[in-house]
From Swiss-Prot:
Domain of life: Bacteria
GO biological process terms on file: translation
The keyword 4Fe-4S belongs to this UniProt entry's keyword annotation: no
Listed Gene3D superfamilies: 3.30.1390.10, Single helix bin (1.20.5.710)
Quaternary structure, from the entry: Homodimer. Part of the ribosomal stalk of the 50S ribosomal subunit. Forms a multimeric L10(L12)X complex, where L10 forms an elongated spine to which 2 to 4 L12 dimers bind in a sequential fashion. Binds GTP-bound translation factors.
Keyword entries, A-Z: Ribonucleoprotein, Ribosomal protein
Nucleus found in the keyword field: no
Record-level Gene Ontology MF annotations: mRNA binding; structural constituent of ribosome
Protein's name in the database: Large ribosomal subunit protein bL12
Matches recorded under Pfam families: Ribosomal_L12 (PF00542), Ribosomal_L12_N (PF16320)
Length: 122
């Protein structure tokens, strides 16, 4: 009996963020590909599309001076365990959360910056 796409999707859905990152890196290495999104050159309509952005990514660029507070903030925001949150903080720059609303992104950015991290919203 072979493994179906649904079996794989269910297994990935149960993984932590750090496990998914490790899986992606292993797949990139095994198949010689990159998971980076292709950049498409936009014409005059590109500005209108950017103005209508509804999903945002929160990127932590540095954990700053107080790593412990940042790890606590990461755990609270993502639900990660201590080990995973520490690994995420130490692997900056890293996407903390992706495809979230502007309000969620702003709140997360505020929480992380109050803890001492450097954060960008993309």
């Amino acid at each position: 009996m072979s493994i179906t796409k649904d079996d794989i999707l269910n297994a990935v859905a149960e993984m932590s963020v750090m496990e998914v990152v490790a899986l992606i890196e292993a797949m990139e290495e095994k198949f010689g590909v990159s998971a980076a999104a292709a950049v498409v050159a936009g014409g005059a309509e590109g500005g209108a599309a950017a103005a209508e952005q509804t999903e945002f990514d929160v990127m932590m660029t540095s954990f700053g001076e107080n790593k412990v507070k940042v790890i606590k903030a990461l755990r609270g925001a993502t639900g990660l365990g201590l080990k995973e949150a520490k690994a995420m903080a130490e692997s900056a720059p890293v996407a903390v959360k992706e495809a979230i609303t502007k309000e969620e992104a702003e709140a997360l950015k505020t929480d992380l910056e109050e803890a001492g991290a450097s954060v960008e919203i993309k």
